[in-house]
């Protein structure tokens, strides 16, 4: 259940930070999220750290939004039938490729200042949020949002990164 293989692509030298060893921090946080959603099979994914310009371009091309954002998730299994995937998930040797996250540390930092959450909390929030999207969670409908933000909040609290009060009470992003 603990196997999560993450490949990193760091176009902005985020991981070269002398103050923090981000790779184990990221891995442990995502393993906590994996455990919370009861994913038993091994998973693999990529995390790409990109500039504000690059994520703006991706956001415009794939989401039709002409602005930079903090995270974009490209789920491999998006739209696949749950019964189809269940056949694979029953195989203990199956490694599930869940997709790719694109994170923009510059936007995350700006959000952390704007929302007064601190960088680590905002980064953790964004990371878990993207990971849950890769695993099929969404927040378009209120009932979906309640489930997704409930999981997200629990994982972050247990990791020492509590949600902003607005997120706790309403299950919505403050972004």
Swiss-Prot record:
Short name of one Pfam family: YbeY
Subcellular location: Cytoplasm
Named cofactor requirement(s): Zn(2+)
Domain of life: Bacteria
One Gene Ontology MF term: zinc ion binding
Binding positions for Zn(2+) per the UniProt entry: 129, 133, 139
Enzyme class: hydrolase
Entry note: cofactor: Binds 1 zinc ion.
Database matches in InterPro entries: MetalPrtase_cat_dom_sf_prd, YbeY, YbeY_CS
Keywords: Cytoplasm, Endonuclease, Hydrolase, Metal-binding, Nuclease, Ribosome biogenesis, rRNA processing, Zinc
GO biological process: rRNA processing
GO CC, alphabetical: cytoplasm
EC number(s) on file: 3.1.-.-
Family: Belongs to the endoribonuclease YbeY family.
Role this protein plays: Single strand-specific metallo-endoribonuclease involved in late-stage 70S ribosome quality control and in maturation of the 3' terminus of the 16S rRNA.
Protein name: Endoribonuclease YbeY
Organism: Lactobacillus gasseri (strain ATCC 33323 / DSM 20243 / BCRC 14619 / CIP 102991 / JCM 1131 / KCTC 3163 / NCIMB 11718 / NCTC 13722 / AM63)
Encoding gene, per UniProt annotation: ybeY
């Amino acid at each position: 259940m603990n196997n999560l293989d993450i490949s990193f692509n760091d176009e902005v030298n985020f991981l070269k930070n002398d103050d923090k060893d981000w790779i184990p921090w990221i891995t442990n946080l995502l393993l906590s999220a994996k455990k919370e959603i009861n994913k038993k099979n091994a998973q693999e994914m990529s995390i790409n750290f990109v500039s504000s310009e690059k994520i703006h371009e991706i956001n415009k091309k794939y989401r039709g939004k002409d602005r930079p954002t903090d995270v974009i998730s490209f789920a491999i299994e998006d739209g696949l039938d749950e019964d189809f995937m269940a056949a694979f998930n029953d195989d203990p040797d199956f490694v599930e490729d869940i997709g790719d996250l694109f994170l923009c540390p510059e936007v995350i930092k700006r959000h952390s200042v704007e929302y007064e959450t601190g960088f680590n909390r905002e980064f953790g929030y964004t990371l878990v949020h993207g990971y849950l999207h890769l695993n099929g969670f969404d927040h378009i409908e209120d009932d979906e949002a309640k489930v997704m933000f409930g999981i997200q909040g629990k994982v972050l609290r247990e990791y020492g990164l509590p949600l902003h009060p607005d997120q706790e009470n309403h299950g919505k992003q403050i972004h």
